[in-house]
Swiss-Prot record:
Organism phylogeny: Bacteria, Bacillati, Actinomycetota, Actinomycetes, Streptosporangiales
Species assigned in the record: Streptosporangium roseum (strain ATCC 12428 / DSM 43021 / JCM 3005 / KCTC 9067 / NCIMB 10171 / NRRL 2505 / NI 9100)
Protein name as it appears in the record: Phosphoenolpyruvate guanylyltransferase
Entry keyword annotation includes Nucleus: no
Catalyses which reaction(s): phosphoenolpyruvate + GTP + H(+) = enolpyruvoyl-2-diphospho-5'-guanosine + diphosphate
Gene3D superfamilies: Spore Coat Polysaccharide Biosynthesis Protein SpsA, Chain A
Residues binding phosphoenolpyruvate, per UniProt: T147, G163, S166
């Protein structure tokens, strides 16, 4: 069980971002992205992390990955990188949360998906501010099936339930669902070409946009 300082002593949020090995990343974009798939996955993750670090109430990002190329790129944008225990997504998140508590025992800890290339820091701040009102909270993805964010107050056990129909799983476990207007960029994860087109309509981060422009034929304008 993760232990942290009381909420009143918290100085902000530490977010844990899991990043797959590039050989396994974004396989549903393979047909459209072709040989650029791995580079696109790195670009999406880097834009996500950079935007999150620009959020005024995010103190640091802990990236969990077993891929050396992804680790180098994400470390370059300011993430603290730790190795992936290779035991699944939620195990990776728990490993990152352990490191987060070690680095900053007074911070709230959250898990943020790595595939939010349109992420806006101000919208993330709205989500984190809302999440801080509850012991544990989560944000569903744009399809209302999965989860893009899960977070806990300092001192609350960190028990993420990502994967598949994780919205229902988090609800069953007692996490509070965050329901706000104006936070589309935090819900818009990208797994398919249609998802990427939807993110493009919101406004992509610079690295992802540059990659899309390189492979534009695979991603027609929205």
């Amino acid at each position: 069980m993760l232990k942290a300082m009381p909420a009143s002593e918290s100085s902000g949020w530490t977010l844990v971002v899991p990043v797959k090995t590039l050989v396994a990343a974004k396989t549903r974009l393979s047909e459209a992205a072709g040989p650029h798939r791995a580079a696109l996955a790195v670009a999406i993750a880097c834009d996500t992390v950079e935007a999150a670090l620009s959020c005024v109430i995010v103190a640091r990002i802990v990236v969990v990955t077993g891929d050396p190329l992804a680790a180098e790129a994400l470390g370059g944008v300011g993430a603290h990188v730790v190795g992936d225990p290779e035991a699944g997504l939620n195990a990776a998140l728990r490993r990152g949360a352990q490191e987060a508590v070690r680095l900053a025992p007074g911070d709230a800890v959250g898990a943020l998906q790595a595939d939010l290339p349109a992420l806006r820091p101000a919208e993330l701040a709205l989500v984190l501010t809302a999440a801080a009102e509850f012991e544990q909270a989560f944000l569903p993805d744009a399809a209302d099936v999965g989860t893009t964010f899960y977070g806990v107050r300092p001192g609350v056990p960190f028990t993420p339930g990502f994967g598949g129909e994780s919205r229902d799983r988090h609800l069953r476990r007692g996490a509070k669902e965050i329901c706000l207007d104006g936070i589309d960029s935090v819900r818009r994860d990208v797994d398919t070409p249609d998802d990427l087109r939807a993110a493009l309509a919101l406004g992509l981060g610079p690295r992802t946009l540059a990659m899309v422009e390189r492979i534009r034929g695979g991603f027609p304008s929205p």
